[in-house]
Amino acid sequence: MANGKYAARKLKQDRQQRRWSDSEYARRERGLGAKSDPLEGAPQGRGIVLEKVGIEAKQPNSAIRKCVRVQLIKNGKQVTAFCPGDGAISFIDEHDEVTIAGIGGAKGRAMGDLSGVNYKVEKVNGVSLIELVRGNAEKPVR
């Protein structure tokens, strides 16, 4: 490793080469996060509900979290989205159009005891899921 009086160029060159060993740097520079993102960088996305699924929570919790499999309209990719709220799953039926957004986990990934679920349902047929759960709104008949 160069460390003399005129070694700045060599030091900079070495640093640039070694940065590629850092996986976060390499992913960021290659744009791999955007390539693998089902929403393609958008904050929200619309999709059609394919099925309701119950996903078991990770240890030490013991619960079946109510989720839905959603096929996105923009690119046909399938994702699993969590349905927040007590009894929220009862307001969602197959073939409903839902709006999903990121669930808000660390580094844009899964949250809490739900592994592999990176999204949550925000709207059902254009109506807020929270409003439906509270009873402030009714689901429109399609």
From Swiss-Prot:
- Keywords assigned: Ribonucleoprotein, Ribosomal protein, RNA-binding, rRNA-binding
Name the residue ranges with Basic and acidic residues bias.
11-32
Q: Name the segments for region: Disordered.
A: 1-44
**Any one cellular-component term (Gene Ontology):** small ribosomal subunit
**InterPro entries xref list:** NA-bd_OB-fold (IPR012340), Ribosomal_uS12 (IPR006032), Ribosomal_uS12_arc (IPR022863), Ribosomal_uS12_euk/arc (IPR005680)
Query: By its UniProt entry, which Gene3D superfamilies does this protein fall under?
Result: Nucleic acid-binding proteins
Its BP terms in the Gene Ontology are: translation
Q: Name one GO molecular function term.
A: structural constituent of ribosome
Relate the protein's function as given in its record: With S4 and S5 plays an important role in translational accuracy. Located at the interface of the 30S and 50S subunits.
NCBIfam families xref list: PRK04211.1 (NF003254), uS12_E_A (TIGR00982)
Read off the HAMAP family from this record.
Ribosomal_uS12_A
Q: What family is reported?
A: Belongs to the universal ribosomal protein uS12 family.
Q: Which PANTHER family match?
A: 30S RIBOSOMAL PROTEIN S12 FAMILY MEMBER
Subunit details for this protein?
Part of the 30S ribosomal subunit.
User: What is the protein named?
Assistant: Small ribosomal subunit protein uS12
Q: Gene name on record? A: rps12
